[in-house]
Amino acid sequence: MRKNHLTPKISKPFLLFVLFSLSTFQYASSQESASYKRFREGNVQYERYNEFNTEFTFTKLDGFEFEKGVERYYPSSVIDVGGTYYMWYSKPQPNTEVVGPNSANDSTRAFHWDLSEIWYATSSDGFKWEEQGRAVKRGAAGRYDHRSIFNPDILIAEGKYYLVYQAAASLSDARWGKAFKIAGDFVPNVLGMAVAESPNGPWLALDKPILTPGPEDAWDGEVVHEPTFFVKGGQYFLYYKSDARLPWKPNISKGDFNKAHADMPLATGVAIASNPEGPYVKSKYNPVLMGGHGSMVWPYRNGVCATLPEGPERNSILCAKDGINFYPVIQGLTVPKGGGAFRPGNFVDVDVTQGKGITWGVGHALSPYYHFVRFDTDLSLEKGDRVRNEYELIQNYMNSGDYEYDASLQLK
């Protein structure tokens, strides 16, 4: 009698499971995950081998104790002139109440930054500061800088000192955002400049702004904010923030740009000039950083680095060799707000002398009142070289034919 050889029945779900498992195994063995690929391509590194691995610590400064009716904020970069540290900052007219743009007048403010002028302070050690007085005053009626000048930064070039700052012409330019009493901004909002042969002045303000908002359909069509400098290849890179792309109720300004850029509440662009006073030409690649609001830039090696307190890449450091194309190098930091770093060597051209990085600076804090804080960190070139050398030792070991790890190469 002939035996029946029955073929075992294979359920469809089991077959699908086997096929899925085989395909998954094949993919895992022949491909790399996105995270692992970024690591192997060198775009991310472990903390021990990342020259940007750091922490920011914050200390309250002496010399800026609480004064009723007085506010100071947005300090500039810090420079060293003859062994004395200098910084500049916004200081609104004392004892003026912030009442919002609908109620403000010549003695009350529309916003916290209204009725401001540029003041400065000096220090011998970076901890204890002494306010020296007003550096740049508001312009005469009818000028672009009549109502308020604020949020300064400093540049040293060609034997002169250049202060750049935001400027508002008139209270009539104050726009109410209606979200709350003091919401809104001056629209337009431009960048002005003053020049001096000494950090102590006297300062001569230029007759025209050095940068203005773009056309109505541009990403920076309303305001230009928070200027700061970097020098490369004989060119002056002026970074600036623009915002107010959110749909306001009512709209601060009309135009299609309110819709085109509604998902981009703030970003950073750059304008470049061969002369400190301009003319500045905005990069065709703008915006170059997606985020901003109290950002800080500094020269490092042959490029530039930046912190972003807000935006999709907030709490990070990003760097660009060309000053245009930034890539994140570390994330998850508590970065200074409105920070101005001490610029060792002041404003060197990084194509001539490598940027030395930063180790300290000054930022502002808003609570319990507007005041300055010192931040300390270690993003120095010296530390960066040391970390790179240590990483090179590991790479040499990985590529050597010897499996014995030389004790002399042990990292500290």
Identify the role of each PLM range.
Residues 1-32:
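Bacterial Sec-dependent N-terminal signal peptides
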Residues 31-412:
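Carbohydrate-active catalytic/glycan-binding domains of CAZyme proteins
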